């Protein structure tokens, strides 16, 4: 492969950065406008999933842990059977059992409740977990909050030595909720 031609073609179509590894060794690395931060929007969800993977590996949480055990102080007064059965795994697969995608971008400024964890757990769990996919921000958000609570730090601090440094990502920032918790469903820059 001609890396110079590939790099020129990538730049021509608006690629923001390029890193090529061969047999575990970086053989080409180029960024255009390195100082500019860009929101990766919902790709943030994948980074939050990495945080959960590290936390599982470190014994901080389990994918089979039920949400009622993970968030006991945040539960609504009435706990449905579906909420009772929902697990951390269901957060990551977006098969939580909630009928609608919640905590989406246009919705967030409209919420009067500042504690989005309590709000997210109060939305109806209309379906049995792991039976229906509904794209949402609730799952990745709650998964990120759980990692933050168990690790004792925000997601950027948790992921910097585990992921960001290894990828050469410097000074990442992340959107936060009204109470200052990282919004793991989006807003990673």
List where the protein language model places each region.
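Acidic-glycine-rich active-site phosphate/pyrophosphate-binding loop
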Residues: 15-29, 112-120, 164-175
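Amphipathic alpha-helical interface segments
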Residues: 107-129, 139
């Amino acid at each position: 492969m001609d890396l110079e031609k590939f790099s020129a073609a990538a730049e021509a179509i608006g690629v923001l950065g390029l890193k090529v590894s061969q047999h575990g060794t970086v053989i080409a690395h180029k960024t255009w406008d390195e100082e500019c931060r860009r929101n990766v929007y919902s790709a943030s969800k994948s980074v939050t999933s990495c945080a959960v993977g590290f936390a599982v590996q470190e014994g901080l949480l389990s994918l089979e842990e039920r949400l009622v055990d993970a968030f006991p102080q945040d539960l609504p007064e009435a706990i449905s059977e579906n909420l009772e059965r929902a697990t951390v795994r269901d957060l990551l697969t977006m098969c939580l059992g909630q009928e609608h995608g919640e905590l989406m971008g246009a919705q967030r400024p409209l919420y009067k409740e500042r504690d989005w964890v309590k709000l997210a757990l109060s939305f109806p769990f209309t379906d049995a977990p792991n039976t229906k996919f509904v794209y949402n921000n609730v799952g990745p958000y709650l998964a990120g909050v759980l990692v933050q609570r168990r690790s004792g730090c925000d997601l950027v601090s948790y992921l910097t030595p585990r992921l960001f440094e290894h990828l050469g990502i410097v000074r990442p920032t992340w959107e936060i909720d009204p109470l200052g918790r990282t919004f793991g469903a989006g807003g990673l820059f």
